[in-house]
């Protein structure tokens, strides 16, 4: 079977650094799905506006194909290995991702969906979209392996000074600032950096800006916006 993208994703992230590790964890993060020309037809999207969430099947296009059958999930601190099929690792044999996102609007005429809570970088190819159906998709009492035993701690996020606070307000909308803070609260650093170089400075490409930050204990400090 050969498959080709039906759409591409527009997101604030121009690189994979900072992209949320799971869909739904940064609920304020908005993006747009732009369909390829052959699917910009009312009949293709008819009825989709009646659903609140959709599933996206997409490609980890910024990652190489994974060759290892065991991976180190961030949830386990990068110390323990599990099988690749027992993880959400982006380094997979077929590089396919699966995400559930909230559907905010449907523009059938332009072939654009606006969604929130996605974990996709900009220009990610999307291969299929399916509606989320609660009666068969939701399993709130399901056990979730190592995820049940490892709570993900959110960090505090602060500007380094009043000047940076003002710069944030001048650069981004209130909605974008909220989303940025949600992203940084997830601590986007690679696991191995947290031990080898905890005071290192980082740059997060968010929209068309480079957000500089470092981490002090459990706090992300925004140092500049370039």
Question: Positions of the model-derived regions?
Answer:
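Basic, Lys/Arg-enriched alpha-helical interface segments
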Residues: 48-54, 153-210, 214-226
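Short coil-to-beta-strand transition motifs
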Residues: 1-5, 91-100, 207
């Amino acid at each position: 079977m050969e498959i080709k993208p039906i759409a591409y994703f527009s997101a604030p992230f121009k690189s994979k650094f900072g992209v949320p590790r799971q869909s739904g964890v940064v609920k304020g993060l908005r993006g747009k799905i732009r369909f390829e020309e052959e699917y910009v037809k009312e009949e293709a999207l008819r009825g989709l506006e009646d659903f609140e969430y959709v599933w996206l099947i997409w490609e980890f296009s910024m990652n190489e194909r994974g060759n290892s059958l065991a991976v180190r999930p961030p949830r386990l601190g990068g110390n323990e290995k599990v099988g690749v099929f027992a993880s959400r690792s982006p380094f997979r044999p077929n590089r396919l991702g699966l995400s559930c996102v909230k559907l905010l609007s449907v523009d059938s005429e332009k072939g654009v969906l606006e969604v929130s809570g996605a974990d996709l970088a900009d220009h990610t190819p999307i291969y299929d979209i399916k509606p989320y159906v609660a009666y068969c998709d939701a399993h709130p009492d399901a056990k979730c392996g190592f995820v049940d035993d490892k709570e993900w701690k959110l960090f505090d996020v602060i500007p380094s000074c009043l000047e940076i606070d003002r710069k944030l307000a001048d650069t981004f909308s209130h909605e974008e600032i909220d989303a940025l803070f949600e992203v940084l609260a997830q601590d986007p650093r690679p696991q191995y950096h947290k031990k080898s170089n905890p005071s290192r400075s980082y740059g997060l490409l968010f929209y068309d800006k480079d957000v500089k930050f470092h981490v002090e204990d459990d706090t992300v400090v925004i140092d500049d916006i370039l």
